[in-house]
């Protein structure tokens, strides 16, 4: 007696055996016999969906959960950066304490990389204003520019302070007190250099310092030095004249054939 509707044939092309107790693969949903139901025996193309492995942290030996489709190396790296309890990981977190403030980025750096426009801290990849969609306005000012502005403001404040002799009225003639005019605000560079260029102002300062350091020489000594210098120059000129005359009077050894 035959039962044609009982059982099913094996889906393996090389087998095709009629099995009365067929088995269904939970990965590819194929029907196989007991000999080919394993993933490796029928070369299942969907076996990777069931081959789930949980990576283990190499430092603390704790299993790290991984989402579907996420690389295990990335999950282990984030676990070491945030949740690992081992000594090397905790020491690393103490060094890399500057977290990037861009949304979605978890990178940490050893030093602060602050944006000059918005003032927030970012990692190396997102330190430029275009990389983190900077909301700050205007162009950033460098540290040298800020220092120059502060120096100019300091010079301007010192140049505009009135002297005590101008502000205090004279006690001898109180009736002749004149109304004081507001001080003029001049440029700190012009007030410092008196309208000269930088090279001229530097040369003028050097001349003044040399004049102050030079000792006062009596006028008689200056006259003696001048006379001595004139005598030396005259003797030098006379010697050169004698040398020129001796060279001109020297007979020439050249002869024309």
Curated annotation (Swiss-Prot):
Matches recorded under PROSITE patterns: UIM, ZF_AN1
Residue segments, region VCP/p97-interacting motif (VIM): 141-151
Location within or outside the cell: Endoplasmic reticulum membrane
Chain positions with Cysteine methyl ester modification: 254
GO CC annotations, alphabetized: cytoplasm; endoplasmic reticulum; endoplasmic reticulum membrane; membrane; proteasome complex
Short sequence motif named CAAX motif, residue ranges: 254-257
Start-end of Low complexity biased regions: 156-179
Pfam families named among the record's database cross-references: zf-AN1 (PF01428), zf-C2H2_ZFAND2 (PF25403)
One example of a Gene Ontology biological process annotation: SRP-dependent cotranslational protein targeting to membrane, translocation
Job of this protein: Plays a role in protein homeostasis by regulating both the translocation and the ubiquitin-mediated proteasomal degradation of nascent proteins at the endoplasmic reticulum. It is involved in the regulation of signal-mediated translocation of proteins into the endoplasmic reticulum. It also plays a role in the ubiquitin-mediated proteasomal degradation of proteins for which signal-mediated translocation to the endoplasmic reticulum has failed.
Subunit structure: Binds 'Lys-48'-linked polyubiquitin chains of ubiquitinated proteins. Associates with the proteasome complex; upon exposure to arsenite. Interacts (via VIM motif) with VCP; the interaction is direct. Interacts with BAG6. Interacts with IGF1R (nascent precursor form). Interacts with DERL1, FAF2, NPLOC4 and UFD1; probably through VCP.
UniProt-recorded name of the protein: AN1-type zinc finger protein 2B
């Amino acid at each position: 007696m035959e039962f044609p509707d009982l059982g099913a044939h094996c889906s393996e092309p090389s087998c095709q055996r009629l099995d009365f107790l067929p088995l269904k693969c939970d990965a590819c949903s194929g029907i196989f016999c007991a000999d080919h139901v394993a993933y490796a025996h029928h070369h299942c193309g969907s076996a990777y969906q069931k081959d789930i492995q949980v990576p283990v942290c190499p430092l603390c030996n704790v299993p790290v959960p991984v989402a579907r489709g996420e690389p295990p190396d990335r999950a282990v790296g984030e676990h070491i950066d945030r949740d690992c309890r081992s000594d090397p990981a905790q020491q690393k977190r103490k060094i890399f304490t500057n977290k990037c403030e861009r949304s979605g980025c978890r990178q940490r750096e050893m030093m602060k990389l602050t944006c000059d426009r918005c003032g927030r801290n970012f990692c190396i990849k997102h330190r430029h204003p275009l990389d983190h969609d900077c909301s700050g306005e205007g162009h950033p000012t460098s540290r040298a520019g800020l220092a120059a502005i502060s120096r100019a403001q300091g010079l301007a404040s010192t140049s505009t302070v009135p002297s005590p002799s101008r502000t205090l009225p004279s006690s001898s003639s109180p009736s002749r007190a004149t109304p004081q005019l507001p001080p003029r605000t001049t440029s700190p560079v012009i007030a410092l250099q008196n309208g000269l260029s930088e090279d001229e102002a530097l040369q003028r300062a050097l001349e003044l310092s040399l004049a102050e350091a030079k000792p006062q020489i009596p006028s008689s000594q200056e006259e003696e030095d001048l006379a001595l210098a004139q005598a030396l120059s005259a003797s030098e000129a006379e010697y050169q004249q004698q040398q020129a005359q001796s060279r001109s009077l020297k007979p020439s050894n050249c002869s024309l054939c």
